[in-house]
Amino acid sequence: MADKVLKGKRKQFINSVGMGTVNGLLDELFEKNVLNQEEMERVKCENATVMDKARALIDSVLRKGPRACQIFICHICEEDTHLAETLGLSSSPQSGNSQNTTDSEVAFPPLPASVNNMPGPAEPEESVDALKLCPHENFVKLCKQRAEEIYPIKERKDRTRLALIICNTTFDHLSLRKGADLDVAGMRRLLTDLGYSVHIKEELTAKDMESELRAFAARPEHKSSDSTFLVFMSHGILSGICGTKYSAEGDPDVLAYDTIFQIFNNRNCLSLKDKPKVIIVQACRGENLGELLISDSPAAPMDSTSQMGSSLSQVGDNLEDDAIYKVHVEKDFIAFCSSTPHHVSWRDVNKGSLFITQLITCFQKYSWCFHLEEVFRKVQQSFEKPNVRAQMPTIERLSMTRYFYLFPGH
């Protein structure tokens, strides 16, 4: 089938296609009623690079089924013979285009037994880098069996989910964050697939970041939403996220983590009361390497435990303050940071950050059957054995009182 053929060629297409062919495909797919005007404009306007446009285009077509994929393949074969030869494509539906599909499937291992043993249907069949959708029977079963334990989600036709990505790449006094564009593109695609309207803000000072957060918290769409995601990508220190003017010697241009929680708590953002607020942070939190050589010495590193003690003290203080309110000031939050306090996070300049890459992969593989905390735990497990560079993602400031299932596809 043409859809299976195209899945096998996806990565090669993204890396090989030119802008002229992308535009030609968009026109062809629009004329053949495969894409509507809005979908065509979204590919053109919401993606900065040719690769991003190509990725958005082929993913849209794959979701449309075999007929759409065959139109896509035929256009390439007729209008860009060099690309067709590079991809090994033929316009004949009966051709042996799918040879590499098997190779692609073989190259990636099946899901772990823990996933395959989950009750309900077998794992949905999706391409290895596509979001697996939750089968309807799983969705209905979980909603009935765990109604009192999970956060309710709104109907797709009624909800207006929003997500915000803030990414700083270029700084006045700090190094360029090469590869950050890959993180932004990957997270935007993931959150869009999960049903969120994604807003992206880049190159901001701490003051600008705070202003954008306050404006985002005030958006009326949150009233008819069931959750939100806040994603931060920047240089960072222990206390917060660096703005573009940060200087260790001079300008303390830092957005404090506390500020983020204050803006979205129940005192300041009632529209998101009792709704999951997910904070993702890709940033260093210090300068220490996240690895050490174990010896027989009884001495133990103290930085993480001292941080834990500080956190416990803050929690105790918060409980006393919260007692005077009828609702908790801070609830339904979860923060997932790319490293433990005082330690660095690693980024591949050609592939993006290790944390965001694994985060996207685990969402794609597991969010159809696992709740959010379990998905995050899968990310942590992928870092459990230190590789060339060590870091350990950390769940922090967790105040969610229920399980948050994303139910992709619903």
UniProtKB/Swiss-Prot annotation:
Q: How is it modified after translation?
A: The two subunits are derived from the precursor sequence by an autocatalytic mechanism.
User: What keyword terms does UniProt attach to this protein?
Assistant: Apoptosis, Cell membrane, Cytoplasm, Hydrolase, Membrane, Protease, Thiol protease, Ubl conjugation, Zymogen
Q: Which InterPro entries match?
A: CARD (IPR001315), Caspase-like_dom_sf (IPR029030), Caspase_cys_AS (IPR033139), Caspase_his_AS (IPR016129), DEATH-like_dom_sf (IPR011029), Pept_C14 (IPR002398), Pept_C14_caspase (IPR011600), Pept_C14_p10 (IPR002138)
* EC id: 3.4.22.36
Name the residues that span the membrane: none
Query: Which Pfam families does the UniProt entry name for this protein?
Result: CARD, Peptidase_C14
One Gene Ontology term of the biological-process aspect is: pyroptotic inflammatory response
- Propeptide-annotated positions? 1-119, 297-322
Catalyses which reaction(s): Strict requirement for an Asp residue at position P1 and has a preferred cleavage sequence of Tyr-Val-Ala-Asp-|-
Which compartments does it reside in?
A: Cytoplasm; Cell membrane
Q: Where is this chain compositionally biased, Polar residues type?
A: 88-104
Q: Which GO terms describe its cellular component?
A: AIM2 inflammasome complex; IPAF inflammasome complex; NLRP1 inflammasome complex; NLRP3 inflammasome complex; plasma membrane
Single GO molecular-function term?
cysteine-type endopeptidase activity
Residue span, CARD domain: 1-91
Quaternary structure and partners: Heterotetramer that consists of two anti-parallel arranged heterodimers, each one formed by a 20 kDa (Caspase-1 subunit p20) and a 10 kDa (Caspase-1 subunit p10) subunit. May be a component of the inflammasome, a protein complex which also includes PYCARD, CARD8 and NLRP2 and whose function would be the activation of pro-inflammatory caspases. Component of the AIM2 PANoptosome complex, a multiprotein complex that drives inflammatory cell death (PANoptosis). Both the p10 and p20 subunits interact with MEFV. Interacts with CARD17P/INCA and CARD18.
Q: Which family does it belong to?
A: Belongs to the peptidase C14A family.
The job of this chain, per UniProt, is described as: Thiol protease involved in a variety of inflammatory processes by proteolytically cleaving other proteins, such as the precursors of the inflammatory cytokines interleukin-1 beta (IL1B) and interleukin 18 (IL18) as well as the pyroptosis inducer Gasdermin-D (GSDMD), into active mature peptides.
Q: What is this protein called?
A: Caspase-1
* Organism of provenance: Felis catus (Cat)
